[in-house]
Amino acid sequence: ALPEADIHVFDNNSSDDTAAVARAAGATVTHVALRGKGNVVRRMFADVDADVYVMTDGDATYDAGAAPRLVERLVHDNLDMVVGSRVDDGQDAHTYRAGHRFGNRMLTGAVAQLFGGGLTDMLSGYRVFSRRYAKSFPALSRGFETETELTVHALELRMPYAEEATAYSTRPEGSVSKLSTYRDGWRILKTICKLFVSERPLQFFSIIGALLALMSVALVVPVFMTYVQTGLVPRLPTAVLATGAMLAAMLSFVCGVIMQAITLGRREAKRLSYLAIPSVRERVSRGLAVGPR
């Protein structure tokens, strides 16, 4: 599909002959000892130096013929990420299982609510990236939750991105998916929560503070009414608990303000790192781009 591209295959401790077959076909094979897709993505962006990155899983489920179209969209529209959203023919229920489809829709919706964006397939493993995206991506995840991190990185830095529908096929006979619907879904959900805390700390701690403040008010109102009527505070432990809850609410809000300032500074640093690299269109106009890899 991309005859001018350099092909890199990252072998994540596979037990078959994938690495040997890829090497015989002319691909550059890199062994990644640390298990997990996130570890592979981290190594890929660190080791490969390219102007355009096409990332796909090695299970033959994604349409390789769509790669030129995705690359063209990236270059023509001067984007930093193009996601190949999965569309199956519906003839085989195992192609895109209902549980995976529902989980993807739920998690994609959660990210859209928390971080914005209009993606419909956040968990797609078929993506095209610009050089400045790849070199500014911190890649902290270890497993399948890396797709969530890839998406949120683009949304947080307000990078231009797009989504293109691509065919999604059944895995080859004898091939078994390593994705666990519940285990990996739970890990992805935890990643979304962690990213919400780290990227939206003021909102997170404000929610916690508001809940604590409401609890404090609910506890103190009856105590205060009794005091107004009798001049006594018969439920002293309740009054102490209400005071502690209000102090915790104020402390939570202050923590949110401090963490938000730290997050903005970190985001500015990533943005400057991102802007230090020319865009795809600029590299093409200067004759720097040498084709996707």
Locate predicted features:
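Acceptor/aglycone-binding surface of glycosyltransferases and processive sugar-polymer synthases
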Residues: 32-47, 52-55, 64-144, 148, ...
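Conserved donor nucleotide-binding strand/loop of the catalytic core
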Residues: 4-8, 19-47
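Acidic ATP/Mg2+-coordinating residue in the GHKL
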Residues: 12, 16
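Hydrophobic helical membrane-anchoring modules
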Residues: 140-293
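Glycine-centered short loops/turns at secondary-structure junctions
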Residues: 26, 77-78, 158
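Acidic metal-phosphate-binding loop of nucleotide-sugar-dependent transferases
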Residues: 60-62
